[in-house]
Amino acid sequence: MSEELQQKLRDQLWEVANKLRGNMSASDFMYFTLGFIFYKYLSEKIEKHANDALVDDEVTFKELWAMEKNEDIEELQEVVKTECLENIGYFIEPNFLFSSVIESIKRKENILPMLERSLKRIEDSTLGQDSEEDFGGLFSDIDLASPKLGKTADDKNTLVSNVLLALDDIDFGVEASQEIDILGDAYEYMISQFAAGAGKKAGEFYTPQEVSRILAEIVTIGHARLRNVYDPTCGSGSLLLRAASIGHANEIFGQEKNPTTYNLARMNMLLHGIKFSNFRIENGDTLEADAFGDTQFDAVVANPPFSAEWSAADKFNNDDRFSKAGRLAPRKTADYAFILHMIYHLNEGGTMACVAPHGVLFRGNAEGVIRRFLIEKKNYVDAIIGLPANIFYGTSIPTCILVFKKCRKEDDNILFIDASKEFEKVKTQNKLRPQHIKKIVDTYRERKEIEKYSHLATLQEVAENDYNLNIPRYVDTFEEEEPIDIHAVMKEIKELEAKRADLDKEIEGYLKELGLVE
């Protein structure tokens, strides 16, 4: 994979995005841009797939559909359509391909009605197919009648046409299957750039790559190949994809509450070459309507919304996810509701890692009861990792990573890592560099103690701290100041005062020579 090609594609796609920026918010022009990129990708992919299927028939996809209809032609068309639906999950007739829309633009036609039909035809082609859930409503956020695209129909048509023409000039590399990672990388880059400009909204759909890397590395330790990976608040799916890639996972599962972000996650899966039959992303509220029943997973990763509200309804006292902990998570801080949900879906030999605000480590009342249950009764807490502040878009609060395992032994300790001071400041953000990530992961893997960085606490030690997991209780990062020699300081002050007096006399002499003072 060429880094130069990667950067070129990133720059080209971001330039296209800026054509749409105008008066739109970052999130608005993100969905249009990523949707159009995805449409071009699907078009090029199906054209390649259909052409490959027709090699022995010595006819191209477009040529076949342009032929005069007869029984043999229609039969061959149906074979191609069925083959596409079974293998890549969707079908686009040649006159609805991205390239056909471009031809209409070059003829100076109004392409919005055709484009709208094209996107609808992609979704409709999957009805009744195994891929229906993966494609249904996928383009619902692309509103071509939106006033954000322009005041008049002509304005809208001109803007969208210019964006599509710019995309047409970019080589996605779909013809070369090994280049799929380059396009996937560029798509991830686009999402990260949009997140940087989305402020607080960024947390709804994006986990910084550095944090994703740590979570993914941790949950894959000890697993040559994961059977599956799950994220209950999957956002755009970036964290899921990272964990699946590092762990060579066969299947990917996720749930996302926001319908728009849910669409983004499904696009992200498909654009990274994940076959429709190998992932299942559901739209819904994870806590209120768990889409995965009693399914358990080899690895669970998540960056749940920090201290979000949930109903904490009485019915959850009888919900197997929460009932054994003794108390429900507070209505105004659902952090432990997400944690208990994730643990419920973790299999006995798996690892779970999630991001949370530091409050989960020490808050009392119901959360204190749940925390004690997880440590004393279950012995599930494997590690606590403190991260630097200001590494997430839209919030500057310090965060931590919590690692859980169900297969811990009675005498296992809990590893505390304080990585809060190891980062590089880049403009207004703090960044974790490869060496910082490596130190965190290596320290966790080797479970080693490093002075002022990590500590292995026994369960007895944690109990003596009343099950408070606040990192400073276990990792002493205090730097002693060198003792001050008062006598030496006083001597230095006297010497400086004497020098100042000498300089004052010297200056006074110069001023007298110049006649400026008597």
Give names to the regions the model predicted.
Residues 40-53, 194, 223, 247, ...:
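A generic secondary-structure signal for well-formed alpha-helical elements
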Residues 195-198, 250-251, 424-425:
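Short small-residue beta-strand/loop micro-motif enriched in glycine and branched aliphatics
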Residues 201-302, 307-316, 322-325, 336-337, ...:
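Conserved S-adenosyl-L-methionine
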Residues 3-5, 157-158, 183, 187, ...:
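Short, flexible segments with low predicted structural confidence
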Residues 4, 290, 294-518:
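A conserved structural/catalytic subdomain of Rossmann-like adenosyl-cofactor enzymes
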Residues 1-214, 218-219, 277-286, 291, ...:
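Non-catalytic, mostly N-terminal accessory regions of nucleic-acid modification and defense proteins
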